[in-house]
């Protein structure tokens, strides 16, 4: 009965006015419940090391073990393929610099969604949120989970593809395990991220070390200039763009730290520091991992391989070749954890702004974790794995993802124009967003020309959010029966998950971490020119 009495003092009564927006903070209940002695809010438990592992862990998933084949296929030579990997890291660095400025100018969790909502208004932010929650992150999580299960099951089925049912069951078991971990403790989740990020870096360090040993022994024929730039097909701008898109998939996840800004210790310092440490490190690791691949395999061998890292291990590691599939499995396990951690904060931020049901803006009374948002992310991913063709959906996801990146960085220029006097602890050179947007526009135009169906479906997915926005957010005078239903469901969900609205988090956003005014108002309307 102790648990029920504590919960009763924290049950929230959502207002019946139907206005979207941040939910009110609860009043502490009587007695020694958690609200009376300690504020219920998201805790600042992510330090610099954990922040770096979130970025590195989300970027390094299965991409570096799979993408080299696609990059080489469209580049036409070893030398140009290596150039594409360096270029991908450079463009990612430009984008991350822009996100660092936005992250300290708009110190709110939610990443792209928070920035687009703040700069362009509620509709634009909702469309980004809708596409992310509906398809982008559930599909990415499903693909990473399926990759994890396939590599774990590979030793059990060495001569054939693992059964689809076994892969799905193992994927869902992994997903539910990590959902439970993230629901139980932020500290547990970040420790898992640190451990598995360290593991995947050790695995890639092994590949790079073996590659350097090969070079010192003189086995680098494919890297000699005469061979490295021996093209087996005539290079073109179109093929180079496709190669870059293949490589950019391996860099996806670089913006995820911005989703958890409010849980960072001293975000104005640690957000840019983590970005400046992580992106160059990942670019270095990716480039020299590919150099190592080419010391063991010819371009033809690499193109014929379905799992480049596994082939590398079989050729050079001998008895220890089992290390490679295990490394990929560990890498994807950490990737699932990172995606769950950050995508749940996106749901949390969207609900707090009134763009998703208010129940998703609640956290556990004692654990201070966003359990409802985590359960929604887990459930949406499970549905995609059961009924969706994940590898077809990922094509649409890539287009939507890149579209969101460009719109967000365009928002940086809009913010510079509308609020020139805004205090910016970090202010990048204007050429940084301009160069990034030039690359972005080029890839977007080329994508429309080469894959009009994929781009068209991606835009349709985004636009399906327009009627949902007007029905669920813009229409405020809903019938009373709708309010009664949502209130009863919210109360039932609170009792089931033992959650309440966070206390004090909104006030901190409005007043700043040290009682100073926040640089931007909390609103879902576009900023006005001053």
From Swiss-Prot:
Highly expressed in brain and lung, and to a lesser extent in placenta and small intestine. Expressed in a subpopulation of astrocytes enriched at glycinergic synapses in the spinal cord and brainstem (at protein level). Expressed in OLIG2-positive astrocytes of the lateral globus pallidus (at protein level). Expressed in CD34-positive, DPP4-positive mesenchymal progenitors in developing subcutaneous adipose tissue. Residues 1-36, 508-530 are annotated as: Disordered. It is found in: Cell membrane. Induction: Up-regulated upon adipocyte differentiation in response to INS. Down-regulated by treatment with rosiglitazone. One of its GO terms (cellular component) is plasma membrane. The gene is Slc7a10. Associates with SLC3A2/4F2hc to form a functional heterodimeric complex that translocates small neutral L- and D-amino acids across the plasma membrane. Preferentially mediates exchange transport, but can also operate via facilitated diffusion. Acts as a major transporter for glycine, L- and D-serine in the central nervous system. At the spinal cord and brainstem regulates glycine metabolism and glycinergic inhibitory neurotransmission by providing for glycine de novo synthesis from L-serine and glycine recycling from astrocytes to glycinergic motor neurons. This is Asc-type amino acid transporter 1. Active from pH 5.5 to 8.5. It is a multi-pass membrane protein. One of its GO terms (biological process) is negative regulation of brown fat cell differentiation. It comes from Mus musculus (Mouse).
């Amino acid at each position: 009965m102790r648990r029920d009495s504590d919960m009763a003092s924290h049950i929230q009564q959502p207002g019946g006015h139907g206005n979207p927006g941040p939910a009110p903070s609860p009043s502490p209940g009587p007695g020694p419940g958690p609200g009376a002695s300690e504020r219920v809010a998201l805790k600042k438990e992510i330090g610099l090391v954990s922040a770096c592992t979130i970025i590195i862990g989300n970027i390094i998933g299965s991409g570096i073990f799979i993408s080299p084949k696609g990059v080489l296929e469209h580049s036409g030579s070893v030398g140009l393929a290596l150039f594409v990997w360096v270029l991908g890291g450079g463009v990612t660095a430009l984008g991350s610099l822009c996100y660092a400025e936005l992250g300290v100018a708009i110190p709110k969790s939610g990443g792209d969604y928070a920035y687009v909502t703040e700069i362009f208004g509620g509709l634009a932010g909702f469309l980004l949120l809708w596409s992310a929650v509906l398809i982008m992150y559930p599909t990415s999580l499903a693909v990473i989970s399926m990759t994890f299960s396939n590599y774990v099951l590979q030793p059990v089925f060495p001569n054939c593809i693992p059964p689809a049912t076994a892969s799905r069951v193992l994927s869902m078991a992994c997903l539910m395990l990590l959902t439970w971990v993230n629901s139980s403790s932020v500290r547990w989740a970040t420790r898992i991220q640190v451990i598995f990020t360290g593991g995947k870096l050790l695995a890639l360090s092994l590949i790079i070390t073996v590659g350097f040993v090969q070079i010192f022994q003189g086995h680098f024929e494919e890297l000699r200039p005469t061979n490295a730039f021996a093209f087996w097909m005539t290079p073109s701008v179109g093929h180079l763009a496709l190669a870059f898109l293949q490589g950019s998939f391996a860099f996806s996840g670089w913006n995820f730290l911005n989703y958890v800004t409010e849980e960072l210790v001293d975000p104005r310092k640690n957000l840019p520091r983590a970005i400046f440490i992580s992106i160059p490190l990942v670019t270095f690791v990716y480039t020299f991992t590919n150099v190592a691949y080419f010391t063991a395999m010819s371009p033809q061998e690499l193109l014929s391989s379905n799992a480049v890292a596994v082939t590398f291990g079989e050729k050079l590691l001998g008895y220890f070749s089992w290390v490679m599939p295990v490394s990929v499995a560990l890498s994807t396990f950490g990737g699932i954890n990172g995606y769950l951690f950050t995508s749940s904060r996106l749901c949390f931020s969207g609900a707090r702004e009134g763009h998703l049901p208010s129940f998703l803006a609640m956290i556990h009374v004692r654990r201070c974790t966003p359990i409802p948002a985590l359960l929604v992310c887990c459930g949406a991913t499970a549905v995609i794995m059961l009924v969706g063709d994940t590898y077809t959906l990922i094509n649409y996801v890539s287009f939507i993802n890149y579209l969101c990146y460009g719109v967000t960085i365009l928002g940086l220029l809009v913010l510079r124009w509308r609020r020139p006097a805004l205090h910016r602890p970090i202010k990048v050179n204007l050429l940084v967003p301009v160069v990034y947007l030039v690359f972005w526009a080029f890839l977007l135009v080329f994508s429309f020309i080469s894959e009009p169906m994929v781009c068209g479906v991606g835009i349709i997915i985004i636009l399906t959010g327009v009627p949902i926005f007007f029905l669920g957010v813009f229409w405020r005078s809903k019938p009373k029966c709708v309010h009664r239903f949502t209130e009863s469901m919210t109360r039932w969900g609170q009792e089931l998950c033992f959650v309440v609205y966070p206390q004090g988090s909104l006030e901190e956003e409005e007043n700043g971490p040290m009682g100073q005014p926040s640089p931007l108002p909390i609103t879902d309307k576009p900023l006005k020119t001053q």
